[in-house]
């Protein structure tokens, strides 16, 4: 029984998910159905939390839109998500960046992680 569940979970997992973590700036392209038409909607922001649970993995992205903070939680392996693109790597010392909710402006900035070659 356990093997069947494990096999079904692996079957439903996406393989094209990039490696990212808290502090990274990502662009999530989401399929949106309006009327009878389907289009892609981009949501760009900072990953403030990531939850790794196999098929049930999720992450939360926060952005500032018109001076108002907007957060959206995504299921990593959801069929609604078309693609995830990492724009910028962030250098942070926490796994969950919930403290960014109280901050705005320069205090909400995240240092960039410079890649070593």
UniProtKB/Swiss-Prot annotation:
<keyword id="KW-0687">Ribonucleoprotein</keyword>
<dbReference type="InterPro" id="IPR001857">
    <property type="entry name" value="Ribosomal_bL19"/>
</dbReference>
<dbReference type="InterPro" id="IPR008991">
    <property type="entry name" value="Translation_prot_SH3-like_sf"/>
</dbReference>
<dbReference type="InterPro" id="IPR018257">
    <property type="entry name" value="Ribosomal_bL19_CS"/>
</dbReference>
<protein>
    <recommendedName>
        <fullName>Large ribosomal subunit protein bL19</fullName>
    </recommendedName>
</protein>
<dbReference type="InterPro" id="IPR038657">
    <property type="entry name" value="Ribosomal_bL19_sf"/>
</dbReference>
<comment type="similarity">
    <text>Belongs to the bacterial ribosomal protein bL19 family.</text>
</comment>
<comment type="function">
    <text>This protein is located at the 30S-50S ribosomal subunit interface and may play a role in the structure and function of the aminoacyl-tRNA binding site.</text>
</comment>
<dbReference type="GO" id="GO:0022625">
    <property type="term" value="C:cytosolic large ribosomal subunit"/>
</dbReference>
<keyword id="KW-0689">Ribosomal protein</keyword>
<dbReference type="GO" id="GO:0003735">
    <property type="term" value="F:structural constituent of ribosome"/>
</dbReference>
<dbReference type="GO" id="GO:0006412">
    <property type="term" value="P:translation"/>
</dbReference>
<dbReference type="Pfam" id="PF01245">
    <property type="entry name" value="Ribosomal_L19"/>
</dbReference>
